Amino acid sequence: MLRRLTRPQLLFAAALGVAGGMYIYQPIFEQYSRDQKELKEKVKILQESEEKRS
């Protein structure tokens, strides 16, 4: 009753799983990237304003 999968079938299933995971989580990664970019810009602006005050 136990049927084994061949190596190509296992590799295909693994690749499909990885690709599916990347597709599902891509919006989360993009949002994180945008948030980090905005945060860096805010920090840069704050540092520039502090340098002007000094």
Curated annotation (Swiss-Prot):
What membrane topology term does the record carry?
Single-pass membrane protein
Spell out which residues lie on the membrane's Cytoplasmic side: 30-54
Quote the tissue specificity entry: Detected in a number of tested tissues including pancreas, brain, heart, kidney, liver, thymus and white adipose tissue (at protein level).
* Localization per Swiss-Prot or TrEMBL: Mitochondrion outer membrane
**Record's keyword annotation contains Mitochondrion:** yes
> Where do the segments described as Required for interaction with CLCC1 lie?
30-36
Q: Which GO terms describe its biological process?
A: regulation of endoplasmic reticulum unfolded protein response; response to unfolded protein
UniProt xrefs under Pfam families: PIGBOS1
Transmembrane residue ranges: 10-29
Q: What's the main place this protein lives?
A: mitochondrion
Keywords on this record? Membrane, Mitochondrion, Mitochondrion outer membrane, Transmembrane, Transmembrane helix, Unfolded protein response
GO CC field = mitochondrial outer membrane
* Topology feature Mitochondrial intermembrane, residues: 1-9
Quaternary structure, per UniProt, is: Homooligomer. Interacts (via C-terminus) with endoplasmic reticulum (ER) protein CLCC1; the interaction occurs at the mitochondria-associated ER membrane, a zone of contact between the ER and mitochondrial membranes, but does not appear to play a role in ER-mitochondria tethering and is not affected by ER stress.
Q: What does this gene product do?
A: Plays a role in regulation of the unfolded protein response triggered by endoplasmic reticulum (ER) stress resulting from the presence of unfolded proteins in the ER lumen.
Q: What is this protein called?
A: Protein PIGBOS1
Source organism phylogeny: Eukaryota, Metazoa, Chordata, Craniata, Vertebrata
Q: Which gene encodes it?
A: Pigbos1
